Amino acid sequence: MFRTQSRYLVRSILANHCVLPSTRMAVSPILNQSIKFYSSKDNATDKSQEKEQPKSILNDDMLARAGFEDVDPKEETSNSEEQATKQTGRKRKRAQTSKDLQRERYANMFYLSALIFGVAGVGYMSRDWDSEKEQEEMDGKNVENGYTPKLMYERLSKRLGSLFTFFSEPAFENLLPPPPPEQYRRPLTLVVTLDDFLIHSNWDTQHGWRTGKRPGLDYFLGYLSQYYEIVVFSSNSQIYSDKTVNKLDPYHAYISYALFREACRYKDGKLIKDLSLLNRDLGKTVMIDVDEDSAALQPENSIIVKKWEGQPDEYLISLIPFLEYLATQPVKDVRPILNSYKDKSNIVAEFAERENKLREQWRKDHGGNNGKPNAGNFIAKLLGIPVPEPKMPLDIIREHGQLQYEHFQKYLQENAHKFLEEEQKLKDEFGKVTLNKLITEGAPNAEEIAKVQQQRALEEAQKQQEGHK
């Protein structure tokens, strides 16, 4: 600002120099003073800038507390000047302190101990098998004992792989309890998937998540429960699917057991449902699923069907004749029968064709009582009454199955409240188990539950006797 005013004053005086010489002489002292003032101001600022040098905010006390040794300020200034003059701009190496040396010593000790423990661990993991049981559990039947590099590496890989089986193997070796005695046992075991076969879940912005039952689901479960031990095996976690299974069978009358994702085997990025862990005879086990990967270990026991997308259909009802026929035949192994169908996904249509051929052959063999005269048929023809065809054994089985289903539904409706009350009593009885007792003694087993049920039955019988008196 001051410089601009002085320049303006000089220009105005020089412009009027030729016109007013007397004025020039009068103003020149003022000009000289202003110029001297300006030059003195600039000199003062330059000297102050030279005197003021940048100072570090880190003093000696702060550096000492941080663990850095004192550095001579003269050496520091000289080094900074040398760095400024050099074009390479190398960074000055910081002097190592006692704490730095201590850290390096501890790090070297840690690396050395880690190396020693690592070598010892590898040697221990590659040792000979402790027992035949361990060899079987590690799936190392083909790996013998010995200390050759190949055998040691194979045992090491088997043992290291077993450390991660917690995340890939099922929670238990036997997913189901032992089967009941023969007189109380159903002929076959039916393993069905839950999602996209029995139910379908859908999400939209208006309603959120909604889950729908497939048409004919209640009849499918109720009718086949008299022939099969039904096991629902879901690919989702128990926390998501457990409530859904309870909604499908609130009285626990149709579904014998429910398994979830925790019971699956994870291998090569696939969720596999291993039927060999069900504690059941594979020759009498049938699995229906919508994913081929789920049946990767036992494809001969499985029927892979198409996913249900939520549209109305009658597929569950159409599956009943084949499954009923399979359960009512005196077969020891269902796998040859299942593998006799070329396309298992279209097993309903192929079974219907076989049934029609069998029915035609039955009519030929038993039509008109093999050509023998029958008075009843003759009178019926005279009266115009249609002659009834002889029933196939399969028709008789279906009539008997339908009658049994109706009786069971009637019994279930009459005693539904009793079932719910008994279930609530069991929950109250075993709900008193504390966490300490659960950890120390474990969960109640089947025998304890049976004892409680027997005790409840005796109490109810005593109450009924007292009521009659």
UniProtKB/Swiss-Prot annotation:
Mapped to this chain, the residue ranges on the Mitochondrial intermembrane side of the membrane are: 126-469
Residue ranges annotated for the FCP1 homology domain, each copy included: 183-326
According to its UniProt entry, the function of this protein is described as:
Essential component of the TIM23 complex, a complex that mediates the translocation of transit peptide-containing proteins across the mitochondrial inner membrane. Required to direct preproteins in transit and direct them to the channel protein TIM23, and possibly facilitates transfer of the translocating proteins from the TOM complex to the TIM23 complex.
GO biological process terms on file: protein import into mitochondrial matrix
Q: PANTHER family this protein is in?
A: DULLARD PROTEIN PHOSPHATASE
**Predominant localisation class:** mitochondrion
| Topological domain ranges for the Mitochondrial matrix compartment | 17-108
SUPFAM superfamilies named in the record? HAD-like
Q: What is this protein called?
A: Mitochondrial import inner membrane translocase subunit TIM50
Entry keyword set? Membrane, Mitochondrion, Mitochondrion inner membrane, Protein transport, Transit peptide, Translocation, Transmembrane, Transmembrane helix, Transport
Tell me its family.
Belongs to the TIM50 family.
Does the record carry Amino-acid biosynthesis as a key word?
no
